[in-house]
Amino acid sequence: MSDSTSETVKKAIIKQVLIESQSANARTLMEKIGENCFTSCVPKPGSSLSNSEKTCVTQCTEKYMAAWNVVNTTYLRRIQQEMGNQ
């Protein structure tokens, strides 16, 4: 295999791993939001959510999403830097 073909294959594999990692991270995020926000905001589940429960879940979800975006952006930047150094 030539160096250029090897490099192309390597980049394709890295790209696929990143996509799968992002998908797994999104699933984990949704699980954590469900576990933490719902548990914290809805102490006694009923047939519907009260306005305060809806507000709490919304704010909690937004907080988790913002934190995840910061972590994900930092992670991707680091991966890109490492790819550039190779």
UniProtKB/Swiss-Prot annotation:
Membrane topology summary: Peripheral membrane protein
Motif, Twin CX3C motif: chain positions: 37-60
Annotated GO biological process: protein insertion into mitochondrial inner membrane
Molecular function per GO: metal ion binding; protein transporter activity
Locations listed in the record: Mitochondrion inner membrane
Top-level division of the source organism's lineage: Eukaryota
InterPro entries assigned: Tim10-like (IPR004217), Tim10-like_dom_sf (IPR035427)
UniProt xrefs under SUPFAM superfamilies: Tim10-like
GO CC annotation: mitochondrial inner membrane; mitochondrial intermembrane space protein transporter complex
Keywords: Chaperone, Disulfide bond, Membrane, Metal-binding, Mitochondrion, Mitochondrion inner membrane, Protein transport, Translocation, Transport, Zinc
Domain topic, free-text comment: The twin CX3C motif contains 4 conserved Cys residues that form 2 disulfide bonds in the mitochondrial intermembrane space. However, during the transit of tim13 from cytoplasm into mitochondrion, the Cys residues probably coordinate zinc, thereby preventing folding and allowing its transfer across mitochondrial outer membrane.
UniProt similarity note: Belongs to the small Tim family.
Role description: Mitochondrial intermembrane chaperone that participates in the import and insertion of some multi-pass transmembrane proteins into the mitochondrial inner membrane. Also required for the transfer of beta-barrel precursors from the TOM complex to the sorting and assembly machinery (SAM complex) of the outer membrane. Acts as a chaperone-like protein that protects the hydrophobic precursors from aggregation and guide them through the mitochondrial intermembrane space.
The protein's assembly and partners: Heterohexamer; composed of 3 copies of tim8 and 3 copies of tim13, named soluble 70 kDa complex. Associates with the TIM22 complex, whose core is composed of tim22 and tim54. Interacts with the transmembrane regions of multi-pass transmembrane proteins in transit.
Protein name: Mitochondrial import inner membrane translocase subunit tim13
Origin species: Neurospora crassa (strain ATCC 24698 / 74-OR23-1A / CBS 708.71 / DSM 1257 / FGSC 987)
Lineage summary: Eukaryota, Fungi, Dikarya, Ascomycota, Pezizomycotina
